[in-house]
């Protein structure tokens, strides 16, 4: 009887796969593809925490993005994730903490994301997303965010 051994991906490969999810999400947002952005989150089971409260879940969050950021590039803005650090917690589980910047005309928002990733059928998805955000004053800019 032959056995097929599946080699676990290296830690570097797992981290690269997680970063690839984030880069695809950023690209999707910046081209106005909110459903593509949301593809990085576990549907429907993702938990969103922002502004000191739980958000509306996957579909409610998609609806919020379309309503509040859709319609034009100016409303959507340009999103950039940076300074990301990934901790592999266990096989199939990882935590990412990173920063982001969203430029919408004269309004610039920066913040921190804490994201719990789990691997489902070989694909990394965000199962918990916590955001802490603030509006940037015109003179305060993060060098990594440009």
PLM region spans:
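Short, low-complexity N-terminal intrinsically disordered segments enriched in polar/charged residues
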Residues: 3-43, 137-146
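Short beta-strand edge/turn micro-motifs at domain boundaries
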Residues: 110-137
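A solvent-exposed, acidic/Ser-Thr-rich amphipathic alpha-helical stretch
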Residues: 17-21, 34-92, 101, 107-108
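A short, structured loop/turn motif at beta-sheet edges
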Residues: 86-94, 117-123
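Sequence/structural signature of outer-membrane beta-barrel proteins
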Residues: 103-105, 135-136
């Amino acid at each position: 009887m032959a056995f097929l051994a599946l080699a676990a991906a290296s830690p570097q490969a797992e981290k690269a796969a997680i970063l690839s999810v984030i880069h695809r999400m950023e690209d999707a947002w910046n081209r106005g593809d909110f459903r593509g952005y949301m593809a990085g989150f576990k549907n429907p089971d993702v938990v969103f925490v922002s502004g000191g409260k739980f958000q509306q879940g996957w579909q409610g969050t998609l609806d919020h993005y379309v309503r509040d950021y859709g319609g034009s590039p100016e409303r959507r803005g340009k999103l950039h994730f940076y300074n990301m650090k990934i901790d592999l917690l266990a096989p199939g589980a990882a935590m990412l903490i990173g920063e982001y910047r969203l430029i919408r005309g004269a309004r610039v928002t920066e913040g921190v994301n804490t994201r719990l990733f789990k691997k489902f059928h070989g694909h990394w998805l965000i199962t918990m997303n916590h955001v802490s955000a603030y509006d940037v004053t015109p003179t305060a800019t993060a060098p990594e965010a440009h």
